[in-house]
């Protein structure tokens, strides 16, 4: 067991060495990128040892040796939890980061600050591993905020672009909303249970726990881009493609789902929280799948597919199947990272062109990238015996065979079908047909720094699901028998999506252009969500503030109260004092009449 914990700590320690080295010589070392890549590879090999030992012995362990601080009766220690979730996630995250870093050496080779970029990527990975291995909420919060700030720095990497700065700020602001939920939950656990250690929280499980669990759901919704807090995820595509690949596969966006997986002992008997997560996930997975249908930016389509898959993971949490949700996190990481690397290969070769309408015919020019992209799209749809099938199919089976909300199930099945539609759309537009890019474009995919990472992720997208699914302990007894129509539900919906996509593609060649329909506008404008939430409230606030300032300050005080009132008083006074017309005869006559009347009145006998 000592060897077991030592290898886990060694894995984390290895990753810190490039950070220390780069602090002494940040920009001058030309071999720093390959050094970081090799360090991550060594950490990946090291992390396989405790994972294999755990699968062999099936024994969890904790390390809580380093005492930080004692606040009254709260004792904070540096504590690592080495259970199934952390030990399985570490090799997956390290393998994918290793591949992405090698790809970055090709994609970012002309960037003058590439060493700093690699340092940021490594810090992003380290903070995620801190979050995954944390055994108390304080340590988890450090990792949670770490992935947030690193995503801000990486999304806004090209800080000279306004869109990149806006997207980075949007990501951090939406995550602040989620952080409010996590902080509220931490405060509740501290005031009611006087502890932040996970095992003590689970042991002191009180009912009801609706307030802290709702805070955790809010935190997960912010970090994992659930409906309402989702707009930052497609906007994050303004960052470099390696950042998108790392962000969407094994780091930040799955942190929210991982938080709920960590706290599933508190949620497994709470029907209210399960229903909330189920409905939230179902709405997210369908809404983002609809938004993906009409996007033309290849990275935006893949980003919306990520959000849709995160909604599916949230549905799985709502079905009380945390191990299935974790399996989908791991399998999804492989093919999603590969999809982003393939799109990065296409974008880089087409001189930073991201519009799929300006691609086409790439199956001849980029045969290896095309093969990987098609296999990634098929794995995303849950095609049998690819990686996605081993997690997506059991999730749909669990949904159809559990006592769940039929409305949520219908939304999830519809989103599953739409996944096949937008995946087929990428294949049709980007890879098939005639080339629609300039003929002078030079295309080359023969660089080993491009081929090798995609090749590794391609192997993972085919075999990783089988390997990972065979290592999951069955916590809830699965159904041994199922009706045939329920067993084939997921495959049927995927096949239906492919058929719809093929039919639409054949029909569009003969259809005349008309004005966009309302469903098309809804999908293209992202459900009017950015218009309503990003434009309307600021416009109303600014116009109301302007009117209040104009009415109260300008018109009332600065204009009406002082200048106009003073002028009016002076006008009345001058009118009153200078109201003489020069009519002397009339004045004398009035005096005479007045005097005459007075004399008559005084001299009149009584």
From Swiss-Prot:
<feature type="transmembrane region" description="Helical">
    <location>
        <begin position="1"/>
        <end position="21"/>
    </location>
</feature>
<feature type="transmembrane region" description="Helical">
    <location>
        <begin position="366"/>
        <end position="386"/>
    </location>
</feature>
<feature type="transmembrane region" description="Helical">
    <location>
        <begin position="171"/>
        <end position="191"/>
    </location>
</feature>
<keyword id="KW-1133">Transmembrane helix</keyword>
<dbReference type="GO" id="GO:0015990">
    <property type="term" value="P:electron transport coupled proton transport"/>
</dbReference>
<dbReference type="GO" id="GO:0032981">
    <property type="term" value="P:mitochondrial respiratory chain complex I assembly"/>
</dbReference>
<feature type="transmembrane region" description="Helical">
    <location>
        <begin position="35"/>
        <end position="55"/>
    </location>
</feature>
<feature type="transmembrane region" description="Helical">
    <location>
        <begin position="413"/>
        <end position="433"/>
    </location>
</feature>
<comment type="subunit">
    <text>Core subunit of respiratory chain NADH dehydrogenase (Complex I) which is composed of 45 different subunits.</text>
</comment>
<feature type="transmembrane region" description="Helical">
    <location>
        <begin position="582"/>
        <end position="602"/>
    </location>
</feature>
<dbReference type="InterPro" id="IPR001750">
    <property type="entry name" value="ND/Mrp_TM"/>
</dbReference>
<dbReference type="InterPro" id="IPR003945">
    <property type="entry name" value="NU5C-like"/>
</dbReference>
<comment type="function">
    <text>Core subunit of the mitochondrial membrane respiratory chain NADH dehydrogenase (Complex I) which catalyzes electron transfer from NADH through the respiratory chain, using ubiquinone as an electron acceptor. Essential for the catalytic activity and assembly of complex I.</text>
</comment>
<keyword id="KW-1278">Translocase</keyword>
<keyword id="KW-0520">NAD</keyword>
<feature type="transmembrane region" description="Helical">
    <location>
        <begin position="272"/>
        <end position="292"/>
    </location>
</feature>
<dbReference type="Pfam" id="PF00662">
    <property type="entry name" value="Proton_antipo_N"/>
</dbReference>
<dbReference type="GO" id="GO:0006120">
    <property type="term" value="P:mitochondrial electron transport, NADH to ubiquinone"/>
</dbReference>
<dbReference type="InterPro" id="IPR018393">
    <property type="entry name" value="NADHpl_OxRdtase_5_subgr"/>
</dbReference>
<feature type="transmembrane region" description="Helical">
    <location>
        <begin position="241"/>
        <end position="261"/>
    </location>
</feature>
<dbReference type="InterPro" id="IPR001516">
    <property type="entry name" value="Proton_antipo_N"/>
</dbReference>
<dbReference type="GO" id="GO:0008137">
    <property type="term" value="F:NADH dehydrogenase (ubiquinone) activity"/>
</dbReference>
<feature type="transmembrane region" description="Helical">
    <location>
        <begin position="87"/>
        <end position="107"/>
    </location>
</feature>
<keyword id="KW-0679">Respiratory chain</keyword>
<keyword id="KW-0472">Membrane</keyword>
<protein>
    <recommendedName>
        <fullName>NADH-ubiquinone oxidoreductase chain 5</fullName>
        <ecNumber>7.1.1.2</ecNumber>
    </recommendedName>
</protein>
<feature type="transmembrane region" description="Helical">
    <location>
        <begin position="301"/>
        <end position="320"/>
    </location>
</feature>
<feature type="transmembrane region" description="Helical">
    <location>
        <begin position="211"/>
        <end position="233"/>
    </location>
</feature>
<keyword id="KW-0496">Mitochondrion</keyword>
<dbReference type="Pfam" id="PF00361">
    <property type="entry name" value="Proton_antipo_M"/>
</dbReference>
<dbReference type="GO" id="GO:0005743">
    <property type="term" value="C:mitochondrial inner membrane"/>
</dbReference>
<dbReference type="InterPro" id="IPR010934">
    <property type="entry name" value="NADH_DH_su5_C"/>
</dbReference>
<keyword id="KW-0812">Transmembrane</keyword>
<dbReference type="Pfam" id="PF06455">
    <property type="entry name" value="NADH5_C"/>
</dbReference>
<feature type="transmembrane region" description="Helical">
    <location>
        <begin position="325"/>
        <end position="347"/>
    </location>
</feature>
<feature type="transmembrane region" description="Helical">
    <location>
        <begin position="482"/>
        <end position="502"/>
    </location>
</feature>
<feature type="transmembrane region" description="Helical">
    <location>
        <begin position="457"/>
        <end position="477"/>
    </location>
</feature>
<keyword id="KW-0813">Transport</keyword>
<comment type="similarity">
    <text>Belongs to the complex I subunit 5 family.</text>
</comment>
<keyword id="KW-0999">Mitochondrion inner membrane</keyword>
<feature type="transmembrane region" description="Helical">
    <location>
        <begin position="114"/>
        <end position="134"/>
    </location>
</feature>
<feature type="transmembrane region" description="Helical">
    <location>
        <begin position="140"/>
        <end position="160"/>
    </location>
</feature>
């Amino acid at each position: 067991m000592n060897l077991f914990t030592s290898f886990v700590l060694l894995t984390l320690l290895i990753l810190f060495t490039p950070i220390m080295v780069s602090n002494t010589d940040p920009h001058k070392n030309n071999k720093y990128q390959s050094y970081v890549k090799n360090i991550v590879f060594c950490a990946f090999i090291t992390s396989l040892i405790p994972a294999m030992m755990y699968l062999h012995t099936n024994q969890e362990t904790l390390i809580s040796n380093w005492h930080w601080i004692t606040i009254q009766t709260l004792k904070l220690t540096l504590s690592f939890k080495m259970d199934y979730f952390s030990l399985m996630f570490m090799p997956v995250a390290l393998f994918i980061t290793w591949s992405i870093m090698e790809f970055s050496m090709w994609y970012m080779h002309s960037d003058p600050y590439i060493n700093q970029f690699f340092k940021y990527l490594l810090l992003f990975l380290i903070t995620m591993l801190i979050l995954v291995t944390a055994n108390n909420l304080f340590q988890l919060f450090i990792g949670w905020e770490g992935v947030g700030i690193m995503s801000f720095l990486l999304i806004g990497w090209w800080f000279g672009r306004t869109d990149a700065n806006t997207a980075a700020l949007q990501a951090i602001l939406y995550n602040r909303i989620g952080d409010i939920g996590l902080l509220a939950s931490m405060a509740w656990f501290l005031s009611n249970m006087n502890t932040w250690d996970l095992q003590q929280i689970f042991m002191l499980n009180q009912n009801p726990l609706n307030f802290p669990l709702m805070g955790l759901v809010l935190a997960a919704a912010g970090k994992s881009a659930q409906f309402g807090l989702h707009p930052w995820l497609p906007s994050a595509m303004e960052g470099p493609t390696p950042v998108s690949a790392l962000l969407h596969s094994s780091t930040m966006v799955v942190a929210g789902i991982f938080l709920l997986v960590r706290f599933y002992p508190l949620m497994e008997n709470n029907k209210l929280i399960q229903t909330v997560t189920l409905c939230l996930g179902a709405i997210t997975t369908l809404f983002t799948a609809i938004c993906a249908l009409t996007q033309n930016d290849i990275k935006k389509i893949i980003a919306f597919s990520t959000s849709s898959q995160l909604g599916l993971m949230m549905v799985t949490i709502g079905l009380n199947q945390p191990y299935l949700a974790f399996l989908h996190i791991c399998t999804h990481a492989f093919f999603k990272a590969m999809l982003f690397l393939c799109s990065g290969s296409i974008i880089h070769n087409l001189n930073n062109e991201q519009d799929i309408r300006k691609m086409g015919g790439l199956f001849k020019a980029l045969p290896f990238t095309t093969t990987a992209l098609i296999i990634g799209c098929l794995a995303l749809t849950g095609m049998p015996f690819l990686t996605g099938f081993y997690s997506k199919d059991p999730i749909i089976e669990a949904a159809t065979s559990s006592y769940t909300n039929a409305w949520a199930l219908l939304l999830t099945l519809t989103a599953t079908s739409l996944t096949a539609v937008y995946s087929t759309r990428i294949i049709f537009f980007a890879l098939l047909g005639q080339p629609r890019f300039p003929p002078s474009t030079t295309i080359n995919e023969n660089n080993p720094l491009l081929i090798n990472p995609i090749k590794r992720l391609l192997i993972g997208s085919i075999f990783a699901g089988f390997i990972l699914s065979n290592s999951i302990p069955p916590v809830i007894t699965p159904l041994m028998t199922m009706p045939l129509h329920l067993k084939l539900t997921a495959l049927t919906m995927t096949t239906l999506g492919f058929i719809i996509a093929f039919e639409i593609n054949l029909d569009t060649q003969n259809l005349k252009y008309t004005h966009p329909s309302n469903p098309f506008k809804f999908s293209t404008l992202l459900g009017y969500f950015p218009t309503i939430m990003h434009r309307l409230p600021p416009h109303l606030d600014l116009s109301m503030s302007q009117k209040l300032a104009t009415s109260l300050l300008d018109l009332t005080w600065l204009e009406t109260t002082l200048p106009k009132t003073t002028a009016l008083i002076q006008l009345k006074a001058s009118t009153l004092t200078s109201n003489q017309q020069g009519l002397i005869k009339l004045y004398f006559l009035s005096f005479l009449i007045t005097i005459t009347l007075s004399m008559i009145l005084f001299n009149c006998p009584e």
